[in-house]
Regions:
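Conserved class I S-adenosyl-L-methionine
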Residues: 123-145
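A short His-aromatic
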Residues: 97-101
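Conserved N-terminal segment of class I S-adenosyl-L-methionine
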Residues: 1-86, 92-96, 109, 139, ...
């Protein structure tokens, strides 16, 4: 399932996430890019003078990333269990369009929290499954069926409320989840930032 990462991304959506990421990560920070895929966002961070480490479970996107960006520190990890990264070793963790694919959300969030330093920032994006989006899909049965096709690798679906509650439940504070992108009811993203508690 993970090897099927598309070659290209929606440029508007990618730009939205890039701007969000750069607004939260200062130059000189050490950032972990979780689910780095082909290294697009890791490369953006590196150009912004950020020390970045990218990890992914999929071999093929990482192979392409290493060809395009040989200067980046990109590593393949197992999908479950602890990552070979030191505790509290990153100022920020970025996980763009990843959380919806994770089977063990509790274990995954625990790993994100473990590698974040005290007070570090978690940044993530995921599709917005708010009420207007669901209504739009309900009015277009083919679109609804395609989105929730069991062969699609989205395992979880989030709204602003459910994502906020999830992050707060894992001890993150200053949680800010915003819906961004097209007009309400169109394809939108949740952009979330949260701080790791100091204890």
């Amino acid at each position: 399932m993970w090897e099927g990462v598309p070659e290209g991304l929606d440029p508007v959506d990618e730009g939205l996430r890039r701007a969000f990421l750069l607004a939260h990560v200062p130059a000189g920070a050490r950032v972990l890019d979780v689910g780095c895929g082909e290294g697009r966002f890791a490369a953006v961070l590196a150009r912004a003078k950020v020390e970045v480490v990218g990890i992914d479970v999929a071999a093929e996107p990482l192979r392409r990333a290493r060809l395009r960006h040989p200067e980046l520190d990109l590593r393949q990890v197992q999908g479950e269990g602890a990552w070979p990264l030191a505790d509290a070793s990153f100022d920020a963790v970025w996980a763009g369009e990843v959380i919806e694919h994770v089977a063990d959300t509790a274990g995954w969030l625990s790993e994100l929290r473990r590698v974040l330093r005290s007070g570090g920032e978690l940044l993530l994006s995921t599709p917005d499954h708010g009420r207007l989006q669901m209504l739009r899909w309900a009015l277009a049965p083919r679109v609804f069926d395609a989105h929730f096709d069991p062969r699609v690798d989205h395992l979880r679906f989030y709204t602003r409320r459910t994502l906020t509650e999830l992050l707060e439940g894992f001890g993150f504070h200053d949680v800010d989840v915003r819906s961004a992108g097209g007009p309400p009811g169109a394809r939108r993203r949740l952009l979330a930032s949260a701080r790791r508690s100091r204890f």
